[in-house]
Amino acid sequence: MRWLAPAPRNGNRARRAPSLAGDLTALTATQAALEIANGNISAQEYTAACLERIAAAEGDVRAFVHIDPEHALRQARALDERRRDGQPPRPLHGIPVGIKDIFDTADYKTECGSPLFKDRQPSRDSTAVARLRAAGAVIIGKTVTTECAYFHPGPTRNPHDLTRTPGGSSSGSAAAVGAGMIPLAIGSQTNGSMIRPASYCGVYGFKPTHGTISRHGALVLSLALDHVGVFARSLADCALMLDVLAGYDAEDPDSRPSAAPEFRAAFATKASAPRLAFVRTPVWHKADPETRTAFEALAQRLGGAATTIDLPESFAAAWADQRVIMYTDMAHNFGAEVERGGDASSQQLRDLVAEGSQNTAMRYLAARDGARNYRAGLAELLTNYDAILTPAAPGIAPKGMATGNPAFNTLWTLTGLPAVTLPLLRG
């Protein structure tokens, strides 16, 4: 790290913040932005409170790979100076945001959790980071990612139980928000890298529709599958971030040249009772018994608002198709770097590249056709329902450092559908 945090301390929970930091860091981003806009607190005060919380918890949680407190405070002071000069506050004015270390940042290295990219210093921000800065965010630091946003874990631990995984690959972003270090962070998902960590760390995670947020300047695993999303402490905060990040970018081939939805306005609109489909996918048997029982009980409590639907066997090949697409694309996009790096990469990543390199064009194209068919099938289902209710993970975060099973995220990533983790149940 660029900043040495306090040494780890014994115990299974991250230590609590000092009282001042605890008071301010308990605010959601929406609340903090309002307090800053009204002049009740300054951007510097709020950033300092977050840094104090980071100093208290980082030795245990290990969510950050690069952080520079003085640089963060300089950003905050510059934002306060703008306000003193009479300039209006921007949507994220003075709000610290953590950046998964696969997104280019002109002021921090971007190493993608891999020795292959050690000391890599981008010359410009990724589109997502540039939009955050333009909205007044304080880019507080880079959060830990698993190696090349794949399975091999980094050092991050679950803030609610240090013996358990935070999930991955967006490990640091989910853990930092879950630990109360920062109110917001960005991550990415190519299989289950946002929805699962959000579930394990007890925060809101929102992966919007494929192409909603630009991936320009982020590590490319698979253009067909890569999504950018957000971690937050409330749905209102997710909407705030989406209003900043969503929108067309000509440098992302999957970005759509159409007006982005107004997420905060939609969130504030009183909605009628939704029609929910409680969906059991072909991997339903992989859920822990406690998860199955809890969701079935939830569906019963919802009564007529939720209809139980078992997806047909025509969806069963989706998990194999996702694997073919992801592995083939990753082998194409950085297989050469992995081969040149030799033992610098984990065996997991080398095995992925080897498998992906063996897939034929015919098998790859069949998997892409499958993805379109699954999406069409789900679109037909959603003509009768407003949303799908289904687990974000098989169960609670596993012990140890393995990042957990993404099986309950795969289908929604493969089909590009939006997904949000709601921290409703606790193990």
Locations of the language-model features?
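Glycine-rich, small-residue loops and helix-cap segments
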Residues: 39, 94, 100, 134, ...
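Short glycine/serine-rich loop segments
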Residues: 124-248, 413-426
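Short helix-loop capping/hinge segments that flank enzyme active sites or metal/cofactor-binding pockets
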Residues: 92-112, 265, 270-279, 324-379, ...
